[in-house]
Every structure is written in C-alpha cells, then in structure tokens.
C-alpha cells in the first residue's frame, strides 16, 4: 500500500520524499479521492477525522489506497492533476501497481 518514506524510495530526497500524491478509497460509496500533501500522516488523519476535504467528509470512512512519493510539491501537483484526469479503471490499475 504505502511506500516507505525512506531515502532511496522513488522520488525520495535525502530525508525521504518531499511530497506525496495519494489516493483514498471512500468506503461509504467506493469512490476514489486523489490529493497531494507534504505530510502524509497528518493529511490522512485530517481526512479520517472529517477535516480533510468536503468530498471525503461526506463519504467516511476512508482508507489509503495508494501513496506515490514525489520529489517536490510542484511534481506532486502535476501528478495529482494527471491522475484526476484518469478514468476510474485507470486509477484502479494504478492502485493495483503499487506495492
């Protein structure tokens, strides 16, 4: 599921990834949510508490489906935008590719 934020991970800098693109599965309706962050644990906690986004707030609970390490925030925003343009089937294939 979630890659280790260790140095050497794809997109990792000396202290680990500078940013993450993540996909959440909303268990209420099995929808997928894509976002980016520089602090994955904090962002997941926000989503799970209902403070993350309007979209996930109404579809709790959520689970992390995939997390992709990114070298910087700009790369994370671009990858988020690219993933948001994918079809559901393409997003599910991307999730299935993750370790």
Regions found by a protein language model. Give the residues of each.
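GIY-YIG nuclease catalytic motif and its immediate N-terminal context
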Residues: 1-84, 88-99
């Amino acid at each position: 599921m979630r890659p280790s934020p260790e140095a050497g991970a794809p997109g990792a800098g000396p202290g680990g990834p500078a940013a993450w693109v993540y996909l959440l599965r909303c268990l209420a309706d099995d929808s997928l949510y894509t976002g980016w962050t520089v602090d994955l644990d904090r962002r997941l906690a926000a989503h799970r508490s209902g403070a993350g986004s309007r979209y996930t707030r109404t579809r709790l609970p959520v689970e992390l489906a995939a997390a992709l390490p990114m070298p910087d925030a700009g790369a994370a925003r671009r990858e988020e935008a690219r993933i948001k343009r994918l079809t559901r089937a393409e997003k599910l294939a991307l999730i299935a590719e993750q370790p």
